[in-house]
């Protein structure tokens, strides 16, 4: 019996981008919605056929963009700017949780979620209709 050696190759590759190489769409998004929070690190993350950009901003904000350079995840240590939250989700949160604020927003294949600073995660469909509290 002959054993054939094989090589395990990782499909995941992270590359730190020089700030000058951050795609224009991403730089524009950050300067529009986070004018006081410049980019301090940008990582281009390739995992198989999936490509994302993981952006860290000054002030404790983290944004993930997909291969089309569309936002799919935003997290903050403090309140996110209202301009980054879809209007229906923002309206729902401010109406039903007036004493709280949003520190996270995420988009997946079927739904979107917001996270409040009190730890609650609220799930919505793609039209912005409330579905449930996600524990």
Regions found by a protein language model. Give the residues of each.
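Short, conserved catalytic or interaction motifs in soluble domains
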Residues: 13
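First exposed extracellular module after export/assembly in secreted or surface-exposed proteins
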Residues: 18-135
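Sec-dependent signal peptide recognition
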Residues: 1-4
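C-terminal motif of bacterial Sec signal peptides marking the signal peptidase cleavage site
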Residues: 7-10
């Amino acid at each position: 019996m002959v054993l054939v050696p094989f090589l395990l190759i990782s499909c995941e590759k992270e590359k730190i981008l020089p700030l000058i190489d951050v795609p224009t769409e991403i730089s524009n998004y950050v300067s529009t919605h986070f004018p006081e929070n410049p980019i301090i690190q940008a990582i281009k993350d390739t995992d198989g056929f999936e490509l994302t950009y993981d952006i860290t901003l000054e002030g404790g904000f983290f944004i993930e963009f997909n291969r089309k350079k569309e936002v799919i995840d935003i997290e903050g240590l403090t309140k996110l700017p209202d301009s980054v939250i879809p209007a229906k989700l923002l309206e729902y949160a401010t109406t039903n949780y007036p004493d709280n604020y949003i520190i996270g927003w995420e988009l997946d294949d079927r739904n979107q979620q917001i996270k409040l600073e009190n730890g609650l995660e609220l799930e919505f469909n793609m039209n912005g209709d409330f579905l449930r509290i996600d524990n």
